[in-house]
């Protein structure tokens, strides 16, 4: 029997957004729950990247993150999903570390995320999802994205 998830964390980079929304709503089965969508601005850049270039990259990624979070909210809420409470969170840092931190801070019941694997690495999980699987304090629902 599937647990009654009341607080769900959905980290996204914008890829596979429709699949993440679909799986999240399937887990809810129309029940009341809070969905926290997380976008992490990955601030890791090569060592010799000029400061101005890094600042520009972070600004662009932040703008993209805001757009993605708005799209996620549209897909998860509305008249067809009246029991879903939505909250958007944006962080900067290492994506896997931030996902685990938010899961701990928010005491979430489950994380719904894509595998992140590519056709080249189809025998492995994506590095972010692999790290989250090992360190997350809760159940992980991985959505196959390839």
Swiss-Prot record:
It comes from the Archaea. It holds the Pfam family Usp. Belongs to the universal stress protein A family. It comes from Methanothermobacter thermautotrophicus (strain ATCC 29096 / DSM 1053 / JCM 10044 / NBRC 100330 / Delta H). PANTHER family: STRESS RESPONSE PROTEIN NHAX (PTHR46268), UNIVERSAL STRESS PROTEIN UP12 (PTHR46268:SF6). This is Universal stress protein MTH_1154.
């Amino acid at each position: 029997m599937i647990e009654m998830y009341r607080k769900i964390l959905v980290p996204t980079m914008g890829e596979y957004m429709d699949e993440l929304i679909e799986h999240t709503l399937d887990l809810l089965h129309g029940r009341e729950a809070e969905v926290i969508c997380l976008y992490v601005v990955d601030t890791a850049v090569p060592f010799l990247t000029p400061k101005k270039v890094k600042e520009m990259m972070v600004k662009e990624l932040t703008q993209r993150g805001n757009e993605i979070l708005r799209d996620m909210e549209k897909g998860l809420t509305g008249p067809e999903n009246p029991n879903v409470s939505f909250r958007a969170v944006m962080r900067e840092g290492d994506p896997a570390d931030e996902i685990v931190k938010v899961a701990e801070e928010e005491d979430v019941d489950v994380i719904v995320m894509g595998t992140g694997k590519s056709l080249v690495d189809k025998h492995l999980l994506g590095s972010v999802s692999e790290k989250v699987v090992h360190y997350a304090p809760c159940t992980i629902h991985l959505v196959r994205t390839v």
